[in-house]
Curated annotation (Swiss-Prot):
Family indicated by similarity: Belongs to the UPF0235 family.
InterPro entries membership: DUF167, YggU-like_sf
Alphabetical list of Pfam families matching this protein: DUF167 (PF02594)
Database matches in PANTHER family: UPF0235 PROTEIN C15ORF40
Protein's UniProt name: UPF0235 protein Shewmr4_1190
SMART domains: DUF167
One Gene Ontology cellular component annotation held by this UniProt entry: cytoplasm
NCBIfam families: DUF167 family protein (TIGR00251), PRK05090.1 (NF003466)
């Protein structure tokens, strides 16, 4: 399974999340997943909300276009981004 898949104009990301990091960033590959560090703690859905906001900003889409498909309660997540207007360089290289 690939970390990043383009499906019918949507982007499907298999992510490994590192909560409580010093800053928000796309770290790179972590096995067959893309590692994303976020500053929010994994308490009461704060990390998921922060992840959605961070990805929406990175891909220049509304938060409503970022859907967590799998992994609501874990570090391993599958996220769909509907019709991204921008693809960060770290992810664009994985699509090639």
């Amino acid at each position: 399974m690939s970390a990043v898949i383009m499906q019918q104009g949507d982007l499907l990301l298999n992510l490994y999340i590192q909560p409580k990091a010093s800053r928000d960033q796309i770290v790179g590959l972590h096995g067959d997943e893309l590692k994303v560090a976020i500053t929010a703690p994994p308490i009461d859905g704060k990390a998921n909300a922060h992840l959605s906001k961070y990805l929406a900003k990175a891909f220049k889409v509304p938060k409503s276009d970022v859907h967590i498909l799998k992994g609501e309660l874990g570090r391993h997540k599958q996220v769909r981004i509907s019709a991204p207007k921008n693809v960060p360089a770290e992810i664009a290289t994985l699509l090639e």
